[in-house]
Design a protein with these regions (language model features):
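A short, structured active-site edge motif that brings together acidic residues
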Residues: 85-97, 124, 182-185
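Short, acidic/polar
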Residues: 37-51, 101-116, 164-165
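Structural motif
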Residues: 50, 54, 115-116, 149, ...
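Beta/alpha (TIM)-barrel catalytic core signal, keyed to glycine-rich beta->alpha loops juxtaposed to Asp/Glu
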Residues: 4-7, 129-317
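Active-site mouth loops of central-metabolism enzymes
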Residues: 28-42, 93-103, 130-132
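N-terminal binding-site loop/beta-alpha segment at the start of enzyme catalytic domains
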Residues: 1-87, 147
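Active-site groove signature of glycoside hydrolases
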Residues: 116-132
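Residues at the N-termini of beta-strands
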Residues: 19, 58, 120-123, 152-153, ...
Length: 319
């Protein structure tokens, strides 16, 4: 794959990212992903190096991932490889019930910066809306973070259409653009489309970053009614659900074969790219990372996107 990838602006900011990023929730999380058991830092550093070698420049983490471990790991890898200037690095603030003042947001950002070993992050996001505190209050703190030079740009995550509009307006009053809204978005989670969020973000020139773009592994085709995922995912995706999505998996395989034997994961990621989103799949090892890279360098036809839309809607209509 060419190391020269087209770059996409994050809203009206000066940040430019590749069409595919890397989400590193798995880097440090033991509960959902089993960090430290089936994989560890020795597996993750090759993922980091291969990601940059593939020309991908966008990595997304959060203070909540592994209780800060994810931030420390990526900071360590950046320092060891002297690759900070090759990255657009994003992290997130968690508005937990005991830290609801704007000052706590700035304190949390400084703690994140200490963990990644930087004086400034590229994109700082609020991980979810916390309704007891007005969105406008949070956005004032985010604008303060930009003015203090602690972050180049700011975004939100898991915000509804109306919340996105309010965040955008509040930041605009401070002269700060809203870069992005990071939401769960995949062939098995179409709420960004059905809720009107995609249209709102398009109208406001706010980028959509798609987390869980292969539905926590469900769109890989690896899991079937006879092979249920381990851990917490077993509760989310039972045999009945896996049976229901098999026609969609079959279509992903069929379309992938028409594009040089692309995998269901690669087709799923390309579908999101065609939708104008920036997917950020995770990777616990080099094999998974290389499979993600295979979503780049080609494009689904409009007809294939429509077929996937239709099959995906069938799955959701039976939920």
């Amino acid at each position: 794959m060419s190391s020269q990838l087209d770059l996409i602006p994050l809203g009206k900011t000066d940040l430019r990212v590749t069409p595919l990023g890397l989400g590193i929730w798995q880097w440090g999380d033991t509960m959902m992903w089993g960090y430290g058991k089936g994989y560890g830092d020795a597996d993750l550093k090759p993922v980091y190096e291969a990601t940059l070698a593939a020309g991908i420049n966008f990595i997304d983490t959060a203070e909540m991932y592994g209780r800060g471990r994810s931030e420390r790991v990526v900071g360590q890898f950046m320092a060891e490889t002297a690759t900070r200037d090759q990255l657009v690095l994003a992290t997130k603030f968690a508005p937990l019930p005991w830290r609801l003042s704007p000052g706590r947001l700035l304190h949390a950002l400084r703690e994140s910066l200490n963990r990644v070993g930087l004086s400034q992050v590229d994109l700082y996001q609020i991980h979810w809306p916390y309704t007891p505190v007005a969105i406008e209050t949070w956005m004032e703190a985010m604008a303060d973070a930009v003015e203090a030079g602690l972050t180049r740009a700011v975004g939100v995550s898991n915000f509804s259409p109306s919340q996105t509009i309010r965040a955008h307006a509040a930041l605009a009053r401070r002269g700060v653009p809203l870069a992005s809204n990071q939401v769960e978005y995949s062939l098995l989670e179409r709420k960004p489309e059905t809720s009107g969020l995609v249209k709102v973000c398009r109208d406001l020139d706010v980028a959509i970053i798609a987390y869980s773009p292969i539905a926590k592994g469900m769109l890989t085709g690896k899991y079937t009614p006879a092979n249920i995922p381990p851990g917490m995912r077993r509760r989310l995706y039972n045999r009945g659900y896996l049976s229901k999505i098999q026609p969609l998996i079959d279509l992903l395989r069929e379309i992938g074969q028409a594009h040089g034997d692309k995998t269901p994961s690669q087709v799923s990621l390309n579908w999101l790219i065609c939708k104008g989103a920036v997917p950020i799949p995770g990777a616990k090892n080099l094999r998974q990372a290389r499979e993600n890279f295979g979503a780049l360098g080609w494009r689904l036809t409009d007809e294939e996107v429509a077929r996937l839309d239709e099959e995906s809607e069938k799955v959701m209509s039976h939920e």
